[in-house]
Amino acid sequence: YFNRYGNYPGVGAWQSEDSPWRDAFYFHEDGSYDCWWGVGNMPAINESSELVRERLLGKDGVIRKWLRAGAHGWRLDVADELSDDFLTEIKKAVLAEKPDALLLGEVWEDASNKISYGHLRRYLQGSELDSAMDYPFRDMVIGFLMGYKNAYQAAEDIETLRENYPREALACALNLLSSHDRPRIISVLGGGPDESQLPESERSKWRLDDNSMGLAKSRFWLATLMQMTFPGVPSIYYGDEYGLEGLTDPGNRRTMPTKEDLHDFDTFAIVKNASAVRRALPFMIDGEIKAFALNDEVLAYNRTGKDGESATVIINRSLRNSHRVTIPALGECASDVISGHECEIH
């Protein structure tokens, strides 16, 4: 389509004004063209081009073709770069092919009130995205476990998401702890440095020491438990289940170790056990949530199902202290899902 470097047969938009794909991009009189954040090999696409719309949104276009082939939805990279009108057209194409398909957007902030390029976006108003990557969830988890915010502030963050997001959008938000754009969670929870503190030659090789890794694993259990008991869809970034380390690119995108190279299965057991809690309590998937703080270091939230069954998740972030707390409860008895112990309610 663009073919600036002549790698493909035929004449691309960059090579000739007569190319049928010329109006699919934004060219200027001097031959320069618009591109994403100045990256020359990522030319900006003209959303109003009929050729672009047909190739992406038409009956045999990219969106519908791959849904027809078996995909169950699409994740749109950098949704902020797409106009509301174009997102609406993408949603129409998705629904025309597969009414129950998911349309998810990469949005780093609260998707219900995001302002990009000076405009309040309409992501979650029904005609565009079904939901978004839940970076606010990630920020809340890290902020609380690392001591950047107390339990009252973390509970407020949870309540803000609950109040701002439509129930359906919160239920299918992508709850991530790591991504290809952010440092890996195990490195963050172990107190990994700001990359600007490291020479570029050391960034991809940086690793936690043994003491820091032990601390990171303790926090990883809490983070993963929150991920598996929070409304939305848990998203495990490849290698996180094996404690793969890494700051930002390229450290967070390095090759997945082979089975023979894996020697530490603590984090795998953590993910497995936290996942078991989610599977054992179906209302963790579609139940209501209500968050509250028990003191500065203890965060809690209730999950309640349609039949009234409920569970309270309690997170003590303290490295040294146990806390005696009082929690609201319904019913006559309760059981500890993790230990299996039962107790009477007084």
What residues fall within each predicted segment?
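Aromatic-lined glycan-binding groove of carbohydrate-active enzymes
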Residues: 152-200
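Surface beta-strand/loop "capping" patches
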Residues: 284-308
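C-terminal beta-strand-rich structural cap/linker in extracellular carbohydrate-active enzymes
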Residues: 344-346
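Active-site-proximal helices and loops of the catalytic beta/alpha 8
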Residues: 2-10, 62, 72, 77-173, ...
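Substrate-binding/active-site clefts of carbohydrate-active enzymes
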Residues: 1-69, 90-96, 113
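Conserved, mostly hydrophobic/aromatic
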Residues: 66, 76, 103, 180, ...
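Short, well-ordered beta-strand segments enriched in hydrophobic/aromatic residues
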Residues: 309-317
